[in-house]
């Protein structure tokens, strides 16, 4: 009978650790490996109760394809594979003016599109 008590204690300990982890990551972030998909997320800095502000957040995958021969000829260092990064950007938005005449975009739809602004 004492042996079953130890198994019950171990089982309850494992269950409590699992429940603690479940509550520690509210949006299921522990299940996501890497970056979440491109979608609308609430911007908590600009949002006010009853007036949420949304922005596009998340990741998109890059595309890779064979470099066309005509492009390869113009490269200083020819490469066989060309990649094109895609970013999570607003497909549709509305412009909003906050107090102090701060103008922002409230995103209403997101999609993955070619990145135009790259970090140097």
UniProtKB/Swiss-Prot annotation:
Name of the protein described by the UniProt record: Glycoprotein hormones alpha chain
Signal peptide as annotated in the record: 1-24
GO CC term, one of those recorded: follicle-stimulating hormone complex
Any GO MF annotation of the entry: follicle-stimulating hormone activity
SUPFAM superfamilies assigned: Cystine-knot cytokines (SSF57501)
Pfam families: Hormone_6
GO biological process, one term: G protein-coupled receptor signaling pathway
InterPro entries registered for this protein in UniProt: Cystine-knot_cytokine (IPR029034), Glyco_hormone (IPR000476)
Keywords in alphabetical order: Disulfide bond, Glycoprotein, Hormone, Secreted, Signal
Subcellular locations according to the entry: Secreted
Sections of the chain in a coiled coil: none
Name of the encoding gene: CGA
Function text: Shared alpha chain of heterodimeric glycoprotein hormones. These hormones bind specific receptors on target cells that in turn activate downstream signaling pathways.
Quaternary state and interactors: Heterodimer. Glycoprotein hormones are heterodimers composed of a common alpha chain described here and a unique beta chain which confers their biological specificity to the different hormones.
Source organism of this protein record: Nipponia nippon (Crested ibis)
The keyword Ubl conjugation is annotated on this UniProt entry: no
Domain of life: Eukaryota
Residues with attached carbohydrate: 80, 106
Intrachain S-S bonds: 35-59, 38-88, 56-110, 60-112, 87-115
The family this protein is said to belong to: Belongs to the glycoprotein hormones subunit alpha family.
UniProt-listed Gene3D superfamilies: Cystine-knot cytokines
């Amino acid at each position: 009978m004492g042996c079953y008590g130890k198994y019950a204690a171990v089982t309850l300990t494992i269950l409590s650790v699992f429940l603690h982890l479940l509550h520690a990551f509210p949006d299921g972030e522990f299940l996501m490996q890497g970056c979440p998909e491109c979608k609308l997320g609430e911007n908590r800095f600009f949002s006010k109760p009853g007036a949420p502000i949304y922005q596009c957040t998340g990741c998109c995958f890059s595309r890779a394809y064979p470099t066309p021969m005509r492009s390869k000829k113009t490269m200083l260092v020819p490469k066989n594979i060309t990649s094109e990064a895609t970013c999570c950007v607003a497909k549709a938005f509305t412009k909003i003016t906050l107090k102090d005449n701060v103008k922002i975009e409230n995103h209403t739809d997101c999609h993955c599109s070619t990145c135009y602004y790259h970090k140097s």
